[in-house]
Swiss-Prot record:
Bilayer topology: Multi-pass membrane protein
GO cellular component terms attached to this protein's record: plasma membrane
Subunit text: Probably interacts with PlsX.
Entry superkingdom: Bacteria
Protein name: Glycerol-3-phosphate acyltransferase
Enzyme class at the top of the EC tree: transferase
PANTHER family assigned to the protein according to its UniProt record, in alphabetical order: GLYCEROL-3-PHOSPHATE ACYLTRANSFERASE-RELATED, INNER MEMBRANE PROTEIN YGIH
Membrane spanning residue stretches: 3-23, 70-90, 110-130, 143-163, 164-184
Keywords annotated in UniProt: Cell membrane, Lipid biosynthesis, Lipid metabolism, Membrane, Phospholipid biosynthesis, Phospholipid metabolism, Transferase, Transmembrane, Transmembrane helix
Length: 212
């Protein structure tokens, strides 16, 4: 019963649609009708500005971290915190508070990793920032980190780098997280291939996107 309650709490935390609610209640803007139509951090930055974007990013990360820490806070050791945290990602992607139409789960996934495996989170953060600087695309950086994350959880335990041994729950959840991110970025992948993806106003833009 405790596990079911924790899953429900984690899902409800993930279902909090920060960008959507900030847009509606503070800016009178429905993010679904602007930009990419996504309710996540990137579109919030683009449509509502830096302040709203930072708040959205922070809350979306923290809700993943908090969901992961629920078993630890409650002193429950019969279930992996990472497993519970995954339900915040499901909530963010399919939120009950927003007709099950959510974001791409990048920030919330980062929060889950931060709460359970901070060293692995920092490693992927470096990959994300490096890719962002080289190619000037949030979407490509997110996809790259997802792919690298899958490869890393499979390879690192073999060499004892960051991950010292295999944890089948951690490995499985990381792969599911990464696949969710990749699948949710299908439209972005199409735009990248056409060189029409949205860019951030810094970096090298090595792929020469036209930013239409």
């Amino acid at each position: 019963m405790n596990i079911i309650i924790m899953i429900i709490i984690a899902y409800l935390l993930g279902s909090i649609q920060t960008g959507l609610w900030i847009g509606k209640y503070f800016y009178q803007v429905n993010l679904r009708q602007h930009g990419s139509g996504n309710t996540g951090t990137t579109n919030t930055f683009r449509i509502l500005g830096v302040k709203a974007g930072i708040v959205t990013l922070t809350i979306d990360i923290l809700k993943g971290t908090l969901a992961t820490l629920i078993p630890i806070i409650l002193g429950i050791t019969t279930v992996s915190p990472f497993f519970i945290g995954f339900f915040a990602i499901i909530g963010h992607t399919f939120p009950i508070f927003a007709q099950f139409k959510g974001g791409k789960a990048v920030a919330t996934s980062a929060g889950v990793l931060l709460g359970f495996a901070p060293s692995f989170f920092l490693y992927l953060l470096v990959i994300f920032l490096l890719t962002l600087y080289l190619f000037s695309m949030i979407s490509l950086s997110s996809i790259t980190v997802a792919v690298v994350g899958i490869l890393s959880v499979l390879i690192f335990p073999l060499v004892g780098f960051i991950l010292t041994d295999y944890d089948w729950i951690f490995t499985t959840v990381v792969i599911l997280m990464a696949l969710t991110i990749i699948i949710r970025h299908q439209d972005n992948i199409k735009r990248i291939r056409k060189r029409q993806e949205n860019l951030v106003p810094f970096g090298l833009n090595l792929s020469k996107q036209k930013n239409k």
